[in-house]
């Protein structure tokens, strides 16, 4: 089957891909590549391919939420990709994590049903965890660059505006330190499809502190600093 949304050709997408939700972020991070080439812009799913540390990598846009990232991952895999690092933003659920810091994700909680039921074809739950080797490399890369990070589980939500005080208490009490929208899909599909995947998140807001948000300038700096560590990992 050929991709329907990502209209790149085989050979125009690398085996190793940094995936982000925001097309603007994909455009920004492409400046870190040598000779980046825009290989897809259909549907706003920007994909760039270039060199970093002498290795070919791609930066691709996955949009918002589980169904969107599932489509993009499936189509990138059709084009030859099999290693994915999601690099996104997250809302902290615990007060000790500061804005602009990083979370290297070790697992994702999620609600049953929907996309997961359709892929798994029953109500069984797959452990939604990243590739250990890739995650360990991320820890090493972030440590080498002296970037402040936490390692822990997140909750993958399907409803951005359903996050209130009760939500924070519920999911933090279950061992989750942050909330985002795509990790569970990424990790579960990777298990089912035989891909390798991992995730790093930049803390853009803290729900445990009343929903305070990072400034645009501070977020961009943290994103660019962390992206170098992510690309170091992809090319090591």
UniProtKB/Swiss-Prot annotation:
Name the Gene Ontology biological process terms.
nucleoside catabolic process
Q: Which stretches are transmembrane? A: none
Pfam name, any one: PNP_UDP_1
> What reaction does this enzyme carry out catalytically?
S-methyl-5'-thioadenosine + phosphate = 5-(methylsulfanyl)-alpha-D-ribose 1-phosphate + adenine; a purine D-ribonucleoside + phosphate = a purine nucleobase + alpha-D-ribose 1-phosphate; a purine 2'-deoxy-D-ribonucleoside + phosphate = a purine nucleobase + 2-deoxy-alpha-D-ribose 1-phosphate
Keyword Heme assigned to the entry: answer is: no
Entry's Gene Ontology molecular function annotations: S-methyl-5-thioadenosine phosphorylase activity
What is a single cellular component term in the Gene Ontology annotation? cytosol
Q: State its Enzyme Commission number(s).
A: 2.4.2.1, 2.4.2.28
Q: Which UniProt keywords apply?
A: Disulfide bond, Glycosyltransferase, Transferase
Does Metal-binding show up as a keyword for this record? no
Q: Which residues bind a purine D-ribonucleoside?
A: 5, 163, 180-182, 204-205
Major enzyme class: transferase
What pathway, per the record? Purine metabolism; purine nucleoside salvage
Record field: temperature dependence: Optimum temperature is 120 degrees Celsius. Highly thermostable.
Which residues make up the binding site for phosphate? 21, 25, 43, 86-89
Family, per the entry? Belongs to the PNP/UDP phosphorylase family.
Q: What does this protein do?
A: Cleavage of guanosine or inosine to respective bases and sugar-1-phosphate molecules. Cleaves inosine, guanosine, and adenosine with a better efficiency than MTA.
Which proteins does it associate with, and in what oligomeric form?
Homohexamer; disulfide-linked. Trimer of homodimers, with three symmetric intersubunit disulfide bonds linking the dimers to one another.
Give the protein name, as stated in the record.
Answer: Purine nucleoside phosphorylase
Organism of provenance: Saccharolobus solfataricus (strain ATCC 35092 / DSM 1617 / JCM 11322 / P2)
């Amino acid at each position: 089957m050929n991709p329907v949304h990502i209209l790149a050709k085989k050979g125009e997408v690398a085996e190793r891909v940094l995936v982000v939700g925001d097309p603007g972020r994909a455009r920004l991070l492409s400046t870190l590549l040598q000779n980046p080439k825009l290989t897809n812009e259909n549907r706003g799913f920007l994909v760039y391919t270039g060199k970093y540390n002498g290795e070919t990598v791609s930066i691709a846009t996955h949009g918002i939420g589980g169904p969107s990232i599932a489509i993009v991952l499936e189509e990138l895999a059709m084009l030859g990709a099999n290693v994915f690092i999601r690099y996104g933003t997250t809302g902290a659920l615990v007060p000790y994590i500061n804005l602009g810091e990083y979370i290297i994700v070790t697992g994702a909680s999620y609600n049953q049903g929907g996309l997961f039921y359709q892929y798994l074809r029953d109500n069984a739950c797959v452990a939604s965890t990243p590739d250990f080797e890739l995650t360990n490399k991320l820890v090493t890369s972030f440590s080498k660059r002296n970037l402040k990070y936490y390692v822990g589980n997140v909750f993958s939500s399907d409803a951005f505006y359903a996050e209130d005080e009760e939500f924070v208490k519920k999911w933090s009490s279950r061992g989750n330190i942050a909330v985002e929208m795509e990790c569970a899909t990424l990790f579960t599909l990777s298990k089912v499809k035989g891909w390798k995947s991992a995730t790093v998140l930049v803390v853009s807001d803290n729900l445990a502190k009343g929903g305070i948000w990072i400034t645009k300038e501070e977020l961009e700096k943290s994103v660019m600093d962390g992206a170098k560590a992510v690309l170091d990992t992809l090319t090591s």
